[in-house]
């Protein structure tokens, strides 16, 4: 029985993940063809690496748009730092190594940021390193690597946007439905507080409450992606704010009822 269940889960494919996997292969094919026909140096390996970095990190159009801006900025900053390094200190090994270490430390610090600026760090560090540690680097190397990396980002962006696009607004609808479902389950837990198993009910209640709060956080993230997809022209802003407000009010009402159920009745004074 367990083997049959495991086999069923193994062959049950997620449609969105399957579509995105096919899109990743298509984007890689475009990169290979572009590199072959235009005779890019190193067989266009940095075009292909950039495509894989972008496609394997996100699947939704809104998320890829949002992060691609930051990745482009990262390549610009990395190319500028590399140019200054080649101009000012190269081929001095000590100074070049020092700049690489300090810049990598700064890019790593940015990459660990909780904001969207985190995407600047990895591509900035990669761009700097692949330019400076190349064999006999020059300003031609700077331009070549900069264009190759950004070409990979553009190819990934176009494939994501125009070939079987996976929109954030669709995912947002699903998350809204799941949130309402979890709110319903949370409300059902109130019945358990009237029984003697209140301790067990508390754990179950906290689980559903955490799910609701997690879904609300995902909604905010997806809404930002939806606005990116429409370049800020969507009229969903006020609608989403109203939905978010109502969800919080429902959660607040359920919590008030739970607290009331947990409060022992006061003994009246004689």
Regions found by a protein language model. Name each.
Residues 226-241, 261:
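Acidic, serine/threonine- and proline-rich low-complexity regulatory regions
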Residues 183, 187, 243-270:
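Soluble C-terminal extramembrane regulatory/interaction domains of multi-pass membrane proteins
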Residues 1-220, 224, 228, 235:
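A transmembrane helix-and-boundary motif of multi-pass membrane transporters/channels
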């Amino acid at each position: 029985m367990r083997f049959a269940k495991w086999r069923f889960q193994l062959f049950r494919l997620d449609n969105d993940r399957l579509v995105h996997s096919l899109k990743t292969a298509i984007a890689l094919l475009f990169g290979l063809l572009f590199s072959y026909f235009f005779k890019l140096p190193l067989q266009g390996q940095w075009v292909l690496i950039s495509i894989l970095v972008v496609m394997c990190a996100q699947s939704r159009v809104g998320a890829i748009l949002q992060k691609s801006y930051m990745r482009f900025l990262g390549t610009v900053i990395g190319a500028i730092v590399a140019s200054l390094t080649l101009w000012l200190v190269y081929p001095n090994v000590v100074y070049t190594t020092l700049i690489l270490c300090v810049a990598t430390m700064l890019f790593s610090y940015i990459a660990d940021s909780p904001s969207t600026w985190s995407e600047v760090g990895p591509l900035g560090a990669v761009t700097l390193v692949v330019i400076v540690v190349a064999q006999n680097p020059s300003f031609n190397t700077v331009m070549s690597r900069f264009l190759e990396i950004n070409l990979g980002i553009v190819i990934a962006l176009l494939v994501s946007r125009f070939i079987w696009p996976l929109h954030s607004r669709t995912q947002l609808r699903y998350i809204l439905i799941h949130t309402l479902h979890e709110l319903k389950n949370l409300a059902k837990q109130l019945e358990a507080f009237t029984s003697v198993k209140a301790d067990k009910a508390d754990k179950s209640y906290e689980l559903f409450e955490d799910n609701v709060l997690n879904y609300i956080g995902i909604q905010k993230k997806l809404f930002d992606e939806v606005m990116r997809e429409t370049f800020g022209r969507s009229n969903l802003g006020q609608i989403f704010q109203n939905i978010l407000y109502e969800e919080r009010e429902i959660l607040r009402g359920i919590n008030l009822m739970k607290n009331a159920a947990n409060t022992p009745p006061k003994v009246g004074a004689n």
